[in-house]
Amino acid sequence: PFEGELELLHALPLEFKVDGQEGIRDPVGMAGVRLEVDVHLIAAGRGPLANLRRAVEEAGLALDAVCVQALASGLAVLTPEEEEMTVLLLDIGGGTTDVAVFRGGRLAHSAVVPLGGDHVTHDIAQLLKIPFEEAERVKRKYGAALPELADPELVLEINQEGGALGEVPAPELARIIRPRMREILHLARQSVDETLGPLEIQVNRVVLTGGGALLRGTDLLARQQYGLPVRVGKPQGVSGLTDVVASPAHAAAVGLVRYGASRPLKA
């Protein structure tokens, strides 16, 4: 089924069935005649994968494996308690948001929403008529996903196109940000609803990670939209430069290290 334009990346077992007995996580050692498995398959386009491999090789490195971002982020941020639950993980990046549902620590659903933090920045730049770099600075320093979190007395000084100075009230900045963040959360929910069923029935908790999760109030906005417990996920169990590495923005990178470490060494 993955001939042509698609290449299989992951075949992740969810549960096994032995002679009709369901809900088996590990059938090794069991006696039976018929073994069935429910598998979550993840594929990607051969063209983008070829470009990725070429970029790694041109950097003088050897590519051992490819891991989807949603799986890597889950390996980094989910707690032992969450690995026993059904959790919706949203990795809000710059250009996209990776959506994943983990059941009992296993990836049961994955999708990509083609929106991320850069789209929020673009909205700010367009509506305030400021350069993209200035919009990113303002978003990171003063942005909030909910207007009620912004200081109503705070007026921000912004550098407009052509070098002119402008002003914007902090709550107005949040009102620019909120619609796009709502859209990202809505599309993520839609992908789960259409595949697994109603989110509030299927999921126990929501974990936000990625650079977009650093936007103040994103967890509160998600709690309002989903009606579920929400937390911001940081990489677990890291040491060394923890003030740098233990950030939602580095969840996928930490997860990739763990994914690579879990793979058998090649002879």
Regions found by a protein language model. Name each.
Residues 56, 91, 124, 188, ...:
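Residue-level signature of catalytic and energy-coupling elements of molecular machines
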Residues 92-100, 223-235:
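Acidic-glycine-rich active-site phosphate/pyrophosphate-binding loop
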Residues 89-96, 102-105, 114-118, 209-213:
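A short acidic Gly-Thr/Ser loop motif
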Residues 114-135:
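A conserved active-site cap/scaffold subdomain adjacent to cofactor or substrate pockets
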Residues 1-89, 107-108, 128-177, 195-198, ...:
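Nucleotide/phosphate-binding catalytic cleft detector across ATP-hydrolyzing
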Residues 44, 143-146, 200-225:
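Glycine-rich phosphate-binding loops at beta-strand->alpha-helix junctions
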Residues 122, 171, 175, 179-186, ...:
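Feature representing long, continuous alpha-helical segments
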Residues 185, 189-204:
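Phosphate/pyrophosphate-binding loops at sites that engage ATP/ADP/AMP, CoA/4′-phosphopantetheine
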